[in-house]
């Protein structure tokens, strides 16, 4: 019973950290990354479809993305979706390929992005702590139901705390790496 609670807590904490990594992958850090376009969707045959499901996205140069739609008729729609997005990119097209030149980030924009990065990290820390609280509540319930002894529950709560500390440290490490990447000129 206790092992199930610990395993579930760890699985949920791993998912929280993975979600943060996915979030960070979509944040523009001054260099081209195909994941930047993950949140951009295009109205395609009546359905909102992610750009990466409509085209090949490649990085020919460190600060350029090329988008080559499989269906040429979707090219103008993809261009419009990129212009409407909050990425601040201007697509240029030659009729078959869209090129996105990633401009250098201004110091002001870098600071804004770092604030976003810190906020997302804090949200992840809160999620991990909420998982800890849920696990501790579940452990107390086991003790109350006389399924586990007080000592076992105390040990398990210590394990949950160590797990929480480990994942918060991992979140801080990921945040620090992303922050460095953004502040790099």
UniProtKB/Swiss-Prot annotation:
Gene3D superfamilies: 3.30.1360.40, Ribosome-recycling factor. GO terms for cellular component: cytoplasm. Keywords: Cytoplasm, Protein biosynthesis. Residues 138-157 are annotated as: Disordered. It comes from the Bacteria. It is found in: Cytoplasm. GO terms for biological process: translational termination. SUPFAM superfamilies: Ribosome recycling factor, RRF. One of its GO terms (molecular function) is ribosomal large subunit binding. InterPro entries: Ribosome_recyc_fac, Ribosome_recyc_fac_dom, RRF_sf. NCBIfam families: frr. Belongs to the RRF family. Responsible for the release of ribosomes from messenger RNA at the termination of protein biosynthesis. May increase the efficiency of translation by recycling ribosomes from one round of translation to another. This is Ribosome-recycling factor. It comes from Desulfitobacterium hafniense (strain DSM 10664 / DCB-2).
């Amino acid at each position: 019973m206790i092992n199930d609670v610990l395993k579930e807590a760890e699985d949920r904490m791993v998912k929280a950290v993975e979600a943060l990594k996915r979030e960070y992958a979509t944040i523009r850090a001054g260099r081209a990354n195909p994941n930047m376009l993950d949140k951009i969707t295009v109205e395609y045959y009546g359905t909102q479809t992610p750009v990466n499901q409509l085209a090949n996205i490649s990085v020919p140069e460190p600060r350029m993305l090329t988008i080559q739609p499989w269906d040429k008729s979707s090219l103008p729609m993809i261009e419009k979706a990129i212009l409407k997005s909050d990425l601040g990119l201007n697509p240029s097209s030659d009729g078959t390929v869209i090129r996105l030149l990633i401009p250098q980030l201004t110091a002001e924009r870098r600071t804004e992005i770092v604030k976003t990065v810190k906020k997302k990290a804090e949200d992840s820390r809160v999620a991990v702590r909420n998982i800890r609280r849920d696990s501790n509540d579940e452990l107390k319930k086991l003790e109350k139901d006389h399924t586990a002894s007080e000592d076992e529950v105390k040990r398990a709560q210590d394990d949950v705390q160590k797990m929480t500390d480990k994942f918060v440290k991992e979140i801080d490490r990921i945040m620090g790496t992303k922050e460095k990447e953004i502040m790099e000129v």
